Amino acid sequence: MNSFSQVPPGFRFHPTDEELVDYYLRKKVASKRIEIDIIKDVDLYKIEPCDLQELCKIGNEEQSEWYFFSHKDKKYPTGTRTNRATKAGFWKATGRDKAIYIRHSLIGMRKTLVFYKGRAPNGQKSDWIMHEYRLETSENGTPQEEGWVVCRVFKKKLAATVRKMGDYHSSPSQHWYDDQLSFMASEIISSSPRQFLPNHHYNRHHHQQTLPCGLNAFNNNNPNLQCKQELELHYNQMVQHQQQNHHLRESMFLQLPQLESPTSNCNSDNNNNTRNISNLQKSSNISHEEQLQQGNQSFSSLYYDQGVEQMTTDWRVLDKFVASQLSNDEEAAAVVSSSSHQNNVKIDTRNTGYHVIDEGINLPENDSERVVEMGEEYSNAHAASTSSSCQIDL
């Protein structure tokens, strides 16, 4: 018999798995005295789980776990299976056994069992759970079907806390419906911030249509759901603000000029950019639509002001211009040389242009004017190519 069944006030009995196996069970198997003999001996297979609350009670405090020693017996004298049946049901093992270690040494195993009402295989599962601890030195060894074990019995905890009936003012079915609606609404609110979709109003309308029948009619009577709807409306405004800022940034980068000339006036460009940025900052208190329009106008004006300069300072255009001038120079030189050879005319290419020197051959008036015009064109082309090449060298 147990010599001590009570603990002093203020003490609670909550041993760990290691303490149950290495101290209490080991001393029980070795028939050694336990200093505070607080765990009772119970024949688990002759008592129902609901009776354990009174039989294994410790002190006057409310308990959620009950501990006891039990001696395992075989189901059949010649068999190897353990008898786990009671008068009202049976205990069924579930899952794998858990190993219990102390300082990297195996000391025991823990088996989890669930109580079923009725007889197998048509038993009804209950909320009673039992952890059965046994001494073991080999994790892969054959478990002993006889001997002492220490058990912890408790009820399975519910997933959600149930309110007391006194806290409600209507029927239990209505309370369940209220909890379900609040849960579904919270799921909608919590999942919506992760979806940055442009057509958010359509998504919100789609959620309302997929909710169970009666939700829209119940919104006016549920203050929690109304508060969540206000939060969702506030979130919609935030999403619209972010989308407008995103479009504004895209327009800013799309409308920038492709290439800036190193010889352009940087001071004027900086002044224009500073003026445009200050205008955008001053219009921060205006509506988002006006900000978007002003931003587009400012950057479009900046782009068009630099359009003329860009056409003349673009390196690719300049390269094509130089190539065309060089090709024109070669053609003009070939024409002049051929004309001078045919007419026996000497061309003086000094400094300013061409001079036709007559060697006694009388040229027609039209031919001489044509030679002079061609010489002037060649001089102008040569001067333009020389200036453009100097700019490139700079």
Curated annotation (Swiss-Prot):
Localization (cell): Nucleus
Function per UniProt: Transcription activator that binds to the secondary wall NAC binding element (SNBE), 5'-(T/A)NN(C/T)(T/C/G)TNNNNNNNA(A/C)GN(A/C/T)(A/T)-3', in the promoter of target genes. Involved in xylem formation by promoting the expression of secondary wall-associated transcription factors and of genes involved in secondary wall biosynthesis and programmed cell death, genes driven by the secondary wall NAC binding element (SNBE). Triggers thickening of secondary walls.
Family affiliation: Belongs to the plant vascular related NAC-domain protein family.
GO cellular component terms listed in the entry, alphabetical order: nucleus
Zinc-finger in keyword set: no
Source species: Arabidopsis thaliana (Mouse-ear cress)
UniProt keywords, alphabetically: Activator, Cell wall biogenesis/degradation, Developmental protein, DNA-binding, Nucleus, Transcription, Transcription regulation
Gene3D superfamilies assigned: NAC domain (2.170.150.80)
Gene Ontology biological-process annotations: cell wall organization; positive regulation of secondary cell wall biogenesis; regulation of DNA-templated transcription; xylem vessel member cell differentiation
Quaternary structure, from the entry: Interacts with NAC083/VNI2.
Expression by tissue: Detected in root vessels of protoxylems, outermost metaxylems, inner metaxylems, shoots and hypocotyls. Expressed in roots, hypocotyls, cotyledons and leaves. Expressed in developing xylems. Specifically expressed in vessels in the secondary xylem of the root-hypocotyl region, and in vessels but not in interfascicular fibers in stems.
GO terms of molecular function: DNA-binding transcription factor activity; sequence-specific DNA binding
Annotation: DNA-binding region: 107-162
Free-text comment about domains: The NAC domain includes a DNA binding domain and a dimerization domain.
Pfam families, per the entry: NAM
Record-linked PANTHER family: NAC DOMAIN-CONTAINING PROTEIN, PROTEIN CUP-SHAPED COTYLEDON 2-RELATED
Protein name: NAC domain-containing protein 26
